[in-house]
Amino acid sequence: MAAQFGNYVDYSGAKAPGSATHVRDPRLQILAATIPQIFANKHILDIGCNAGSVSIQLSLDFHAASVTGVDIDPKLIAQAEKLLALRASRATPPTSCSAPVVDYFPMSAVLTHGYRIEPHNKPARTPSAASAAWPYVTFFSADWVLPSDQDATDSYHVILALSVIKWIHLEHRDVGLTTFFAKCSSSLKPGGYLVIELQTWDSYQKAIRPNHAPHFQETLKELQLRPETSFDSLLANHGLHLCASSDALPRRINVYQKA
């Protein structure tokens, strides 16, 4: 089935065998091992959050101070809200003396007694202030590339763009990708990190197949920027410099730091 924006349900990159929403994402584990404390007590933006698994893990498993997840598809944000309610309902909240214990209550407890923390019924369409209540995760639906009255500078310690750059590039072309990188830079605090999961040019070509996103065929012909050769210099122009990378997974993960 073709996808309008590349936002396949439950798609946020190649999945590890046997992976599930409560199993720590290997990309996050690699990042935490490469740059210790990259997530703990940090304010994080997850762009293209899909159904919310990564955003929620950042809070529950990697102890972020707050996480904001944004996706262009409100249906995926609704799924993310339900997953957040489920995972938060299975955990013990943090106390002044201890961190939360995730997956403490069995699924049967939720099935029998319902959510301890109810999901939001209507996905937000604008970013609100970071949630003041545990688990400190906020979701909203928007095309983050586009300017908004809610945009703020120096807001985040970390911005994640996992398995989403290709779709931003195809949707908004070279000029939109440049705008996206500039907005990432302005949204990061000094010393903050932009994390990109690179999608190679051949994956762009595969994306326009009839059963994927054929409506991007003409757009692809217009693109001059290439992920393998153009991104580092383009990001450097916006004050974001490559500081770490990993080829441990099928897709390279690059980390850029704001000067």
Q: Where in this protein do the model-derived segments appear?
A:
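A short acidic, Gly/Pro-enriched loop at the edge of an enzyme's catalytic core
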Residues: D149-I159
